[in-house]
Amino acid sequence: MGIKNLNTLIESNSLNGINKRHLSSFSGKILAIDTNVYLYKYLYGKSNHIDGMFFMINKFKKFNITPIFILDGKPPDEKTDTIKNRRLIKDRLEEKLSLLKIEIKALETDMEIQEIQKEIDVIEKKIIYVNRNVIDKTKTLFDLMGVVYIEADCEAEHYCSKLCNLDIVDGVVSEDMDTIACGSKLVIRNFTNRDDNVESYYLQDILYDLNLTNKSFIDLCILLGNDYNHR
């Protein structure tokens, strides 16, 4: 549910809650992976999602980390309006994309073609969607590489947090700050295949620095605004 400005607030007010750590420090740990976040990241990038996931899995193996990949399930009813708005925006962008692809065929100069192509490239990234084909290919890769994955009955970040709260996993790997709001005691962010260093968010240290209880922290996240509560 993307908490607005939460990361900025934590960075500004919690000296102990965020630490830069090398992945080797998580050797022997079990981590839940908010998979769809990284599928979108790899689809947006220059490499395809299979390449991205392949290198991600190998990096975990390199540092003796056991990943459990969690795939998105059905979003909650409270998110219906947000999903409808996103779909409307996507439909408008697809319509604009179709018109631009027609327009570019009629252009003559390289400069004009390059300008329109840039606009096309931007829109194509904005309408990227993790569809069933992407999920099926990713699951096939997981099977081939012998890693565990779960298709959640809810949004992946919530399921990851549940596993963390139940001490089934030691932490959550995600770029979404809502995993912290959901109570994950450890959230690992800024994971890339190019760098072995990550940022680790420790919920108890964050609460201590902010002088908040867990309930007060959740109330703060609601006030900041999210996919259910627009501010």
What are the functions of these language-model segments?
Residues 1-100:
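Non-catalytic, usually N-terminal nucleic-acid engagement modules in DNA/RNA processing proteins
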